């Protein structure tokens, strides 16, 4: 049962985002919903973002400073950061937030009220407002639908749009623990949406735009997802291998789709 004002945990992972981290943190502190804690994980930054995080004097903010990276893959380091931040958190609802993104003022309040109205909900996601910092242009985008006879999983929104019931997030992290050191091209948003799509019946994508999603040229948001070349097909095969491993872990039968065979063939073509 939820208490009147349940505690919310916002998990922020940061690596060298000095241009965005202050706006990110302030967007959390300025939330209209006040019963929050903010866990900031700095992953060995060497720019001014680390200094800013150290300077924050607010009882709502808890800080973790990683001393060394464990993986060459940024996605695996992100997963490690979120796992360690979650262990430090106490909230009943867990929000994920990349340090180059931000929340609109009423996001947490809207999500909490939605969870309260439907206590069976395990996962919520809103739509992102794409922000292009070089021009300060912003645009709203909505998820496209897929014909799933040709696709194994649906389109999904980025990490910073995601929120989980604590018990469900804990279960998710435990059940994908086989992948903690594998599938280096997969960010946590891909792992989460695949897990949720196949193994949760209680999730919802809100028709709301409550997250600023920064198209950071330093990050993964622009270059890697639009070019459907060899790297794109290789990453897609890794996603399929993750799905198979997840089904094996869950002791469920997995049937390969047309999408899998097309992806496999394209990898063979590029390999040759």
Task: Report each predicted region and the residues it spans.
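Short, acidic, metal-binding catalytic loop of nucleotide-sugar glycosyltransferases
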Residues: 26-35
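Flexible acidic/His/Gly-enriched loops in nucleotide-sugar-dependent glycosyltransferase catalytic domains
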Residues: 66-86, 108-174, 240-244
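Acidic donor-binding/catalytic loop of UDP-sugar-dependent glycosyltransferases
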Residues: 48, 101-114
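A conserved acidic beta->alpha catalytic loop
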Residues: 42-51, 68, 98
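N-proximal low-complexity "stem/linker" segments adjacent to membrane-targeting elements
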Residues: 1-27
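Hydrophobic/aromatic residue at the end of a short beta strand that borders the catalytic acidic motif
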Residues: 97, 103-107, 130, 164, ...
